[in-house]
C-alpha cells in the first residue's frame, strides 16, 4: 500500500496508531507483527513469550494450523448468510457445544460483552414469564469488581470507576455484592424480584481473585433455594484456562446459564455463546434477541475446530498439570521478595500482586518485555500470567526464570 511506505520503525507504527486511532487503550510500547504458538514477534523480529494471550483468547496457541485451515476452508464457501436462513455449519456447532457441555440450547453471539448482555435479557425475561416478577421490577445481582465488558449494560453492572465515570445514567436494577461472600449474597437473593446472579468463577480483571472452595457450591444452593438463575461468566475462565473445560467443573456445580467467549475461536474470530436448558432459553422468541454476525457459518466452523484442538491436544489437562508447579515455583523463588504482596491462581490463570506503594507495576511489565516476556498490569498493582495452554514445561520453566530475574531486579533497589 503506497500510503504506508513511511512506516518503518516501531515508533512510526506507534505514532501512526496514536494519530489515527481513538485513545481508548494505553498499550505497552511494542509493535507486534506475527505470532506462532506461545510466541509473538515484533517488527524487528524480537521474540517474546505471550503471557497475556489476548486475555485468554488464544488458549490453543497463536495461529493454530488446524483452526486456521478450518477458517480458510469455510471462507471459500460461505462466510455469512444472517440468521434469516439456516446454514450447514451453525447446527453442527450448536450440537457440538450443547453435547459437550450438557445443555439443551446455545445462543451464539460475537463478544463476551454480548454474551453478558444476552444473559441480562435472558434473566429478566425468565423472571417475568416464569418467576412472575412484576413488570419492570426484575433485579440482577452481580459481584463488586466484576468485569463483563464496556457496553452500557455491562458498565451498569460494574463498580469500576474507570469504566463508569461520566457514562451515566445506567441501566437500573443491578445490585452489587462482595465477591466470595455467601452471607451478603443470601441477603440479596431473599428479594423475590431477583431473577439472576451472574458471577465469574475466578475474577480475572479484578486481579485473578480465586474464591474459597465452598463459594460456588454455596452459590448454587442459594440460587436453588430462592429460585434465581445461577449464571457463570466463563468468558475468561472457561475452555481449559483453569485446568478444566469449565472452571465450575472444579466445584461439581452446574449453573443454569454459562457464558463463553474468547478461546471459543482460538483467537481467530470474535465468537461467544450462551448455554442454557430449554426451560430458560426458550423464553426468548424469534425477533426478541439476535445479531447479524452471531452464529455465522465462518464463526461456527472456527468454533468447532477450536474445541477439537482443545480436546484432542488435551490442553485442559496441560493447564491442570503445569499450573500448580508453576505457581509453587514462583512462590519458592520469590518468597523473600520485598515488593510482592501475593502470588495466586488456578490452572494457568495466574497473577502476581505487587506492593504498588513500593514499585510501579507498569515498569515491571516493561522490564519483562525487555527480558522477552509480554503481559499487562491490572489496576496498577497486579500482573497477569496467562500463557497459551499449549506451553510446555520447559518453556514454562524458562518463563519462570524470566519472571524471577525481573522481580529480583526491582527487589535489589530495596
Swiss-Prot record:
Its EC number is 2.6.1.13. Its cofactor is pyridoxal 5'-phosphate. Transmembrane segments: none annotated. It is found in: Cytoplasm. It comes from Plasmodium chabaudi chabaudi. GO terms for molecular function: identical protein binding; ornithine aminotransferase activity; pyridoxal phosphate binding. Belongs to the class-III pyridoxal-phosphate-dependent aminotransferase family. This is Ornithine aminotransferase. The gene is OAT. The modification N6-(pyridoxal phosphate)lysine is found at residue 262. Homodimer.
Amino acid at each position: 500500500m503506497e500510503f504506508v511506505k513511511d512506516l518503518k520503525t516501531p515508533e512510526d507504527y506507534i505514532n501512526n496508531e496514536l494519530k489515527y486511532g481513538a485513545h481508548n487503550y494505553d498499550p505497552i510500547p511494542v509493535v507486534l507483527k506475527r505470532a506462532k504458538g506461545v510466541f509473538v514477534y515484533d517488527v524487528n523480529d524480537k521474540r517474546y513469550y505471550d503471557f497475556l494471550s489476548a486475555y485468554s483468547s488464544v488458549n490453543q496457541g497463536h495461529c493454530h494450523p488446524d483452526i486456521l485451515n478450518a477458517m480458510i476452508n469455510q471462507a471459500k464457501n460461505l462466510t455469512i448468510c444472517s440468521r434469516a436462513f439456516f446454514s450447514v455449519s451453525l447446527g453442527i456447532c450448536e450440537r457440538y457445544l450443547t453435547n459437550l457441555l450438557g445443555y439443551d440450547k446455545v445462543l451464539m453471539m460475537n463478544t463476551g460483552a454480548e454474551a453478558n448482555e444476552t444473559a441480562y435479557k435472558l434473566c429478566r425475561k425468565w423472571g417475568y414469564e416464569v418467576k412472575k416478577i412484576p413488570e419492570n421490577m426484575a433485579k440482577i445481582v452481580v459481584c463488586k469488581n466484576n468485569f463483563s465488558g464496556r457496553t452500557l449494560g455491562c458498565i451498569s453492572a460494574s463498580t469500576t470507576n474507570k469504566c463508569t465515570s461520566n457514562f451515566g445514567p445506567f441501566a437500573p436494577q443491578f445490585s452489587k455484592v462482595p465477591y466470595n461472600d455467601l452471607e451478603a449474597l443470601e441477603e440479596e437473593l431473599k428479594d423475590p424480584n431477583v431473577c439472576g446472579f451472574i458471577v465469574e468463577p475466578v475474577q480475572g480483571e479484578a486481579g485473578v481473585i480465586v474464591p474459597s472452595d465452598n463459594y460456588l457450591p454455596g452459590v448454587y444452593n442459594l440460587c436453588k433455594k430462592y429460585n434465581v438463575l445461577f449464571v457463570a461468566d466463563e468468558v475468561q475462565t472457561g475452555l481449559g484456562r483453569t485446568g478444566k473445560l469449565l472452571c465450575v467443573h472444579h466445584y461439581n456445580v452446574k449453573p443454569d446459564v454459562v457464558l463463553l467467549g474468547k478461546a471459543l475461536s482460538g483467537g481467530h474470530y470474535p465468537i461467544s455463546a450462551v448455554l442454557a436448558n430449554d426451560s430458560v432459553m426458550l423464553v426468548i422468541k424469534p425477533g426478541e434477541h439476535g445479531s447479524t454476525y452471531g452464529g455465522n457459518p465462518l464463526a461456527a466452523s472456527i468454533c468447532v475446530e477450536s474445541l477439537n484442538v482443545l480436546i484432542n491436544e488435551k490442553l485442559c489437562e496441560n493447564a491442570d498439570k503445569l499450573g500448580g508447579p508453576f505457581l509453587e515455583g514462583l512462590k519458592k523463588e520469590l518468597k523473600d521478595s520485598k515488593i510482592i504482596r501475593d502470588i495466586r491462581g488456578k490452572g494457568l490463570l495466574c497473577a502476581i500482586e505487587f506492593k504498588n506503594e513500593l514499585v510501579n507495576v507498569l515498569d515491571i511489565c516493561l522490564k519483562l518485555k525487555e527480558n522477552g516476556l509480554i503481559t499487562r498490569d491490572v489496576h496498577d498493582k497486579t500482573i497477569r500470567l496467562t500463557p497459551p495452554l499449549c506451553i510446555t514445561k520447559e518453556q514454562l520453566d524458562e518463563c519462570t526464570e524470566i519472571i524471577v530475574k525481573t522481580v529480583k531486579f526491582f527487589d535489589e533497589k530495596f
